[in-house]
Amino acid sequence: MRAMFKEIGIFIKEDLSNSIDNEALNSMINSLSNLDISLYLDESSNNKNKNFTILNHEEYVKKVDIVIVFGGDGTLLNAARKYLNYEIPILGINMGNVGFLTDISTENFEKTIKEVLEGSHKIEERNLVSAKFGNNNL
């Protein structure tokens, strides 16, 4: 498979709350591991999966072509804030309940990720809003 994205950053929800989530995550990570790509994890992540090369933040943002977020909309927003200044595309895999922003389901993961890696995708620019009330950031 010829991939447009070869250096894949992984961003995982801090606390996957049940074994079904962990089982789905492990299955998706195994699918990725079988492709001709490299998987990276930012050292600030709590997940230390053996399939990932762990990089410090500066190396990570220089190395990765795309970040795949495993979690819900909140996890995707956390990743967007963390990588805001680096122009790295972010792909959200919905492991939460809502999925407005992370609209790719775990059931469609394998088909979708192959299409994305082959270049069959469209990158959408999104805005991130910040607000301040008094001295408090919201």
Language-model features, listed with the residues they occupy:
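Flexible, glycine/proline-enriched loop segments at strand-loop-helix junctions
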Residues: 12-17, 97-103
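Solvent-exposed alpha-helices and their adjacent loops that cap or buttress functional pockets
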Residues: 1-3, 59-62, 84, 121-123, ...
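Catalytic core of DAGKc-family lipid kinases
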Residues: 100-138
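Short, structured patches in soluble enzyme cores that scaffold and shape functional sites
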Residues: 12, 95, 133-135
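Short, glycine/charged-enriched secondary-structure capping and boundary segments
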Residues: 25-26, 82-85, 104-107
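N-terminal glycine-/serine-/threonine-rich phosphate-binding loop
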Residues: 2-70, 75-77, 81
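Gly/Ser-rich helix-loop-strand patches that form or flank binding pockets
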Residues: 78, 83-96, 100
